[in-house]
């Protein structure tokens, strides 16, 4: 709880990505899907105490803030200017990569949240959340010769994806679970050492987090 200019009981949500000392060996990243509706409700109440000019900023924050947000880690960059116009374009996946990846491996644990919410903050009865952990190799140059950078709009659908490795068992795992997955060909493409590529790694606590759905 926090006081803002004398206004009590603002709900401050926890971070959706944080560090933990309880990794398989050493530290681990904890990804969590966070319900932001209590915080948004408190901001609406706080807005009523402000002048009309100050309330404009609260309206802006509420307009940008989804009802739920999924914790995620990815290899790439985040472009704030692009995100202001289209949040999905803010996540720019991948870094230059030389060579053909063979396997994708690591350790994870997973516990789905108790309630699954849609983008409007409504509970979806009977639906269980699922995580996503996967890696992609994609062509760094398009047919027109220009640089290609996949974003949240096309990371799963782009014709430039060449190889993909994904954890497909998305059930709950109480203990640390190892995965080692071979990369598979996508879009009937073959790896060509003469081409330029980018490698993207994506981990998220809710596979539908890009659509603001999850638990």
Task: List each model region and its residues.
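Short amphipathic, basic-aromatic surface patches that mediate peripheral association
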Residues: 108-123
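Aromatic (Trp/Tyr/Phe) and Gly/Pro-enriched flexible surface segments
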Residues: 1-105, 126-206, 210-215
């Amino acid at each position: 709880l926090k006081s803002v200019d004398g206004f009590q009981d603002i709900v401050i949500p926890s971070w959706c990505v944080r560090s933990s000392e309880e990794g398989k060996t050493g530290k681990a990243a904890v990804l969590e899907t966070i319900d932001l509706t209590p915080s948004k409700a408190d901001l609406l109440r706080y807005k009523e105490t402000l002048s009309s000019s100050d309330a404009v900023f609260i309206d802006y924050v509420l307009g940008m803030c989804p009802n739920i947000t999924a914790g995620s880690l990815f290899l790439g960059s985040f472009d704030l200017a692009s995100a202001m116009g289209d949040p999905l374009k803010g996540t720019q996946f991948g870094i230059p990569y030389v060579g053909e990846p063979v396997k994708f491996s690591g350790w994870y644990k997973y516990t789905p949240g108790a309630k699954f919410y849609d983008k409007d903050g409504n509970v979806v009865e009977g639906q269980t959340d699922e995580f996503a952990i996967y890696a992609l190799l994609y062509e760094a140059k398009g047919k027109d010769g220009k640089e290609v950078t996949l974003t949240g709009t096309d990371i799963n659908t782009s014709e430039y994806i060449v190889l993909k490795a994904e954890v497909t068992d998305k059930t709950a795992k109480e203990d640390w679970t190892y995965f080692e997955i071979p990369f598979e060909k996508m879009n009937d493409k073959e790896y060509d050492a003469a081409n330029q590529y980018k490698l993207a790694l994506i981990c998220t606590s809710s596979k539908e987090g890009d659509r603001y759905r999850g638990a």
